[in-house]
């Protein structure tokens, strides 16, 4: 498995324009996102955040993450793994490979971009990946994913190119595509046990954009203060 790591210096206030170049020359749709601006805002509050992208390498996305967020970026192209599985050329079972797929330490990632990856995973693979996402995510961190609201017998893969912090270009992907599975909200919450839904948006194309957050654990002193306040009678 190939992991691409890119380290950038400081943040820049201006958004990269590389993702928007040549937009008029393409017929690929540009779609406004509701969750992505909130995901960006969450990471912007952190100094040198660590970001994990589960999609393919896209140059303009790398540029945006470096220039806009000043982040350390890891790219783990799980869509390529799914493509190999559907083609019948995968060497390992997708669900079984998840526990060893990621070398990242527990609680070491500030943000994870899942895109629509979960739509193409079977139940076992989806659950195994969700466990790893919860494990790797740092308290206060965010996860963004797109989930279809109805099953599709066959759908092409999509590459999501960041145009700016509010819009994404839906680009064609050369993979074979596959069946899309619709996950009920309760199943998503159960899968990501330990995370909470910070925001959920239903778009006109019937895609649910979901932003999940990991709660920040209270420090021992904060816990003691809270317990003390709860047991101290109020003055009248």
Region spans (language model):
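Class I (Rossmann-like) S-adenosyl-L-methionine-dependent methyltransferase catalytic domain
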Residues: 1-43, 51, 58-101, 142-236
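A short His-aromatic
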Residues: 120
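Hydrophobic adenine-recognition pocket in adenosine-nucleotide-binding enzymes
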Residues: 117
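A short glycine-rich, Lys/Arg-flanked "PGG" loop and its adjoining helix->strand segment in the class I
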Residues: 127-139
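Hydrophobic beta-strand segment of the Class I
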Residues: 112-113
């Amino acid at each position: 498995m190939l992991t691409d790591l890119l380290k950038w210096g400081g943040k820049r206030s201006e958004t990269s324009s590389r993702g928007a170049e040549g937009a008029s020359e393409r017929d690929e749709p540009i779609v406004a996102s509701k969750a992505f601006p909130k995901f960006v805002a969450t990471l912007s509050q952190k100094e040198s955040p660590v970001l994990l992208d589960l999609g393919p390498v896209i140059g303009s996305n790398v540029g945006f993450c470096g220039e806009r967020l000043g982040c350390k970026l890891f790219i783990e192209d799980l869509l390529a793994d799914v493509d190999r599985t559907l083609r019948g050329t995968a060497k390992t079972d997708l669900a079984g490979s998840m526990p060893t797929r990621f070398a990242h330490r527990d609680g070491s990632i500030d943000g994870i971009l899942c895109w629509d990856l979960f739509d193409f995973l079977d139940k076992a693979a989806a659950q195994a990946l969700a466990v790893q996402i919860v494990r790797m995510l740092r308290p206060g961190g965010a996860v963004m994913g797109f989930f279809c609201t109805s099953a599709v017998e066959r759908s092409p893969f999509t590459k999501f190119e960041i145009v700016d912090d509010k819009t994404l270009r839906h680009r064609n992907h050369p993979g074979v595509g596959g069946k899309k599975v619709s996950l009920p909200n309760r199943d998503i919450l159960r899968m990501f046990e330990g995370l909470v839904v910070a925001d959920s948006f239903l778009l006109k194309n019937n895609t649910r954009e979901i932003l999940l957050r990991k709660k920040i654990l209270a420090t021992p002193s904060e816990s003691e203060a809270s317990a003390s306040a709860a047991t101290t009678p109020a003055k009248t």
